[in-house]
Design a protein with these regions (language model features):
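Classical Sec-dependent N-terminal signal peptides that target proteins to the secretory pathway
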Residues: 2-28
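N-terminal amphipathic/hydrophobic interface segments
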Residues: 24-257, 273-281, 286-292, 352, ...
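Outer-membrane beta-barrel proteins and related beta-barrel translocases across Gram-negative bacteria
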Residues: 197-210, 215-261, 267-268, 273-274, ...
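A generic signature of intrinsically disordered, low-complexity regions enriched in glycine/proline
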Residues: 7-8, 15, 61, 68, ...
């Protein structure tokens, strides 16, 4: 009885002790687990088979297994651990933690992920979390991503949740991790302190690698890592900024003792760089400013700027001064252009460029641009004061006006409906040649410095037809003032496919114009063409045949024009053409041989207009063309003719670029065609023999030869010989052209030679000599050094022709291009080499 009482008392004491101990545990953690083990007299608890433990501060820990020591107040959790603090808005994921409750410190082992304030994602390992201080720390490589797609890679870090301050070493910052490495910027720092909330930072040993297309090039971003730059590309443009330290506050980033270059990585110094005491980037103004800056060429300072600025790479357009340009000319002297660019609105801008010459000439050039949804307008005008022409005793003002306007009309039922307007006007005939280097906008500058063209043009087309109409005014910049203009107003061209079937295709075209030229010579033409072109059909013997039927209705009237009468005329013309060829092929071990004899029989029962005073070059390439005399607008080639030709080609089976080809062709007719152009070579019953030879069977040689042999086979009236030799880095081309007899009277030889020393250096030489006059027309000698970001060359030019204000000249130019900054060209003083 006494023993039973003792046992009962002992059990009661144990139960009371357990209840007291369990109450203490609950004060620290509230366990919600599937299975629990209690050992060591109730001091140790082990939770099994997944569950959670919630602290008295509301921290909830989920895990597969828990171990809690009541005496030390340390909680261990293992297996798919999740720590969630909904009050302070952070979540941690790992597989192994130790939670020292008395110190409110959590240690993780292995890979650890954290989501802070629902916008900062941490990926690290072996992390220490100080709950009271709200700080995360790790000495392992870590990755941090924010809601703005910025990624921070650090060899170690410390992060204050409350302040949003991230501290670390060997830091790599990626501007937009959602993009691939080709399209994002990269920043590296030795040490740094970053405020993730305000984006302020202070860092040492700064290196900024911009994506390669930052300045318009489409090269890919080279790979960069924290340990070395061994994998960096050595032959691509790689814009970057290095600095001793950097900081950012209130949208202002400052790089101290900075160096900027866009050159690719190499073993030595970059070809060019800008070294500044301070580089400041103002994100509000989108502007980069350099203080006390030196422009270095291969580490040699060549220019000093107390201060200069330019728009940052995000800016497509920003008002401000553009890079000056220096020019030199024997006629105009030395000049400097100082462009100022002004943004009027999102789609409008203005560039004003004053140019100052040391010869008291002044030039002001203005360009206005406007781009709308369906149109684009650009106008460039300039006025020059103080220039004295050799043809005038006075210093007169001269000017130019160039304009271009394109409008998409977006008319229904048309795939394209476009209006184009172009205006070209100068007040001095040699203006385009003399002021060539001073004209800024090359987009609307006339392509031909000997003539101008202004026009208004409409274009419409769909799947089966196209229509063009407009007016045009052309001016040649030589000759008398009265005869230099040509007015074509209006003109039109219409083409359509009427239909097609298994036999061929019907086409219709119509064109017309009024052409006033040579002061009072007027021609008006309305031309309608209907033709049928058959499909190719083959005979059982292997002949390939086709035919064409061409009808033309020509309506004309003229004044002081020999081919048109002064009263309205209407004519109907026709041309019939039959072509046949017999293609043959023979295969050898290494070559394929092709032979194709070809015949064209054509008949025009009517007459053609007189084109004997015009010019037309016939060769083996165009002799089978229906309009081989280029008279299709007004006539068909008159009479009956047979054109016979043959082509032989020998082609390498393994390399189609290695071949030998020869073409021969001639025209035979029943009577002379005196209305054909005098130099055509097909006026007589038996025409010249036209031929061409191409020889490219050898690795290093290419021979191209065109010729025209008179019908008696006595004289070669046309020779055009081109020989190209290429061996490794050496290339030379010789071209000889000779015209005799009916073809013309000229004789010239030209040479172009290039030698590429390596990928960065080459030399070029070009010359042409007129053997008819025994005069050399020009010499060009150029040496160029070029890499991904710098191009420097020396040009020697010598010309022997004279054109009013232009005189024979000898010049040496030195130019250097620093991508993406500017191009500078300077003429070398003649006293230095004469």
């Amino acid at each position: 009885m006494k023993n039973n009482l003792k046992i009962t008392i002992i059990n009661a004491i144990l139960i009371i002790f357990f209840l007291i101990s369990n109450t203490y545990s609950i004060e620290q953690f509230n366990f919600d687990i599937t299975e629990i083990e209690i050992t060591d007299n109730g001091n140790k608890f082990k939770g099994l088979k997944r569950g959670s433990a919630t602290s008295d501060s509301g921290l909830k820990i989920e895990a597969d297994t828990f171990e809690y020591d009541k005496i030390t107040n340390i909680l261990n959790a293992y297996g798919d651990v999740k720590i969630n603090d909904p009050i302070n808005d952070y979540i941690l994921f790992t597989n192994d933690i130790t939670y020292i409750k008395n110190k409110e410190t959590i240690f993780t082992k292995g890979i650890t992920k954290a989501i802070i304030e629902s916008k900062y994602n941490f990926l690290s390992k072996n992390v220490t979390f100080y709950r009271n201080k709200k700080e995360l720390h790790s000495s392992e490589f870590s990755e941090v991503k924010d809601e703005k797609l910025t990624q921070y890679n650090l060899s170690e870090f410390n992060y204050s949740i409350e302040q949003g301050i991230l501290k670390g070493s060997n830091i790599e910052v990626i501007s937009d991790y959602s993009k691939n490495s080709k399209n994002r910027d990269l920043y590296t720092y030795k040490d740094g302190i970053f405020n993730l909330k305000t984006k302020k930072y202070n860092a040492s040993d700064t290196k900024i690698y911009l994506k390669n297309n930052t300045f318009g090039k489409n090269n890919s971003l080279v790979s960069v890592n924290l340990e070395s730059e061994e994998n960096l590309s050595t032959n691509e443009n790689a814009p970057r900024i290095y600095g001793a330290s950097s900081s950012k506050k209130d949208e202002i980033t400052v790089i101290n003792k900075g160096i900027f270059t866009s050159c690719g990585f190499n073993d030595g110094c970059p070809p060019w760089s800008i070294k500044a005491e301070k580089i400041t980037h103002n994100e509000n103004k989108k502007q980069i400013t350099y203080d006390n800056a030196f422009l270095n060429i291969y580490n040699l300072p060549v220019l000093y700027f107390p201060k200069f600025f330019h728009p940052d790479p995000t800016v497509k357009r920003q008002s401000g001064l553009l890079m000056p340009q220096i020019n030199d000319s024997d006629i105009l002297g030395t000049s400097i252009l100082i462009p100022y660019f002004h943004v009027i609105s999102e789609n409008k801008d203005l560039t004003v460029t004053p140019t100052i010459f040391d010869t008291h000439i002044k030039m002001l050039q203005t360009e206005y641009r406007q781009k709308n949804k369906s149109s684009n307008f650009i106008v460039d005008a300039a006025h020059v004061q103080g220039y004295k022409s050799n043809l005038s005793q006075n210093k007169n003002g001269i000017s130019h006006l160039f304009a271009k306007y394109d409008l998409d009309l977006n008319l229904p039922n048309f795939e394209n409906s476009i209006l184009n307007l172009k205006v070209e006007k100068v007040t001095n005939d040699t203006y385009l040649k003399i002021f060539d280097t001073n004209l800024i906008d090359k987009e609307i500058k006339p392509n031909n410095d000997g003539g101008l063209s202004s026009n208004l043009n409409f274009q419409f087309n769909n799947q089966t037809s196209d229509f063009t109409t407009g007016v045009s005014v052309n001016e040649t910049l030589n000759g008398t003032n009265s005869d230099r203009y040509q007015y074509i107003l209006p003109y039109y061209n219409y083409n359509t496919v009427l239909g097609y079937n298994e036999f061929g295709q019907f086409n219709f075209s119509s064109s017309g114009y009024n052409n006033l030229h040579n002061t009072n010579s007027l021609q008006t033409s309305l031309n309608n063409d209907l033709n049928f072109l058959s499909r190719d059909f083959f005979t059982k013997m292997g002949f390939q045949n086709n035919f064409g039927i061409y009808f033309k209705n020509l309506n004309t009237i003229g004044k002081n024009y020999s081919n048109y009468k002064s009263s309205p005329q209407s004519e109907i013309m026709s041309l019939y053409n039959f072509e046949t060829n017999y293609p043959l092929i023979k295969k050898e071990e290494n070559y394929i041989n092709y032979i194709k004899p070809k015949l064209s029989i054509r008949l025009n029962p009517g007459e053609m207009k007189n084109y004997s005073n015009s010019s037309r070059s016939i060769n083996s390439d165009n002799i089978f063309s229906i309009d081989r005399l280029s008279v299709g607008g007004d006539s068909f080639e008159e009479g009956r003719s047979l054109t016979a030709g043959i082509n032989y080609t020998k082609e390498n089976i393994n390399d189609i670029n290695k071949y030998f080809s020869i073409d021969l062709a001639s025209v035979y007719r029943d009577k002379d065609l005196n209305k054909a152009p005098n130099n055509s070579g097909i006026r007589t019953k038996s025409s010249n023999l036209f031929g061409s030879v191409d020889f490219s069977l050898l690795d290093d040689y290419l021979l191209e030869y065109d010729f025209s042999l008179d019908n008696n086979f006595n004289n070669i009236e046309y020779n055009n010989v081109g020989v190209t030799f290429k061996k490794n880095n050496f290339l030379t081309k010789f071209n000889f052209i000779e015209e005799n007899g009916k073809i013309g009277q000229s004789n010239s030889v030209a040479n172009v030679t290039e030698y590429k020393f390596n990928e960065n250096n080459y030399v070029y030489f070009g010359t042409r000599r007129n053997r008819e006059t025994s005069l050399t027309e020009y010499y060009d000698l150029i040496y160029e050094y070029k890499n991904d970001c710098l191009s420097a060359n020396i040009k020697y030019k010598k010309t022997y022709y004279q054109d009013r204000d232009l005189t024979p000249d000898e010049q040496i130019f030195f130019s250097i291009t620093l991508f993406p900054l500017t191009t500078l060209e300077q003429k070398v003083n003649p006293d230095l080499y004469r």
